[in-house]
Amino acid sequence: MNPLIQSLTEGQLRTDIPAFRPGDTVRVHAKVVEGTRERIQIFEGVVIARKGAGISETYTVRKISNGIGVERTFPIHTPRVDKIEVVRYGKVRRAKLYYLRALQGKAARIKEIRR
């Protein structure tokens, strides 16, 4: 990577991010601005992908809300995310879990591993 770009992005990298992988269930505390107020919105779901590297790394979280699948993509190093909690560690053999989009109910479950 270009040393100039690397030196600019070093100060913006967050160090309070827990180690999580695709298949893990996470609880993301995102800051949401509504008018003049700012509040914390919790989004809990399964991590189905992690993409990129460095300052531009992102992850996608999927949950089922009222029978409808909802996915949100968050940058890892954004200040808009207050904190990330790992709720459960999942055992998967893929880096991208896009096949979960086609599964429903108990078929969409992921086996849990103890850490």
Swiss-Prot record:
Molecular function GO terms recorded: structural constituent of ribosome
GO biological process terms held by the UniProt record: translation
Pfam families documented for this protein: Ribosomal_L19
Keywords: Ribonucleoprotein, Ribosomal protein
HAMAP family per record: Ribosomal_bL19 (MF_00402)
Biological role stated in the UniProt entry: This protein is located at the 30S-50S ribosomal subunit interface and may play a role in the structure and function of the aminoacyl-tRNA binding site.
Protein family: Belongs to the bacterial ribosomal protein bL19 family.
Protein name as catalogued: Large ribosomal subunit protein bL19
Species assigned in the record: Streptococcus sanguinis (strain SK36)
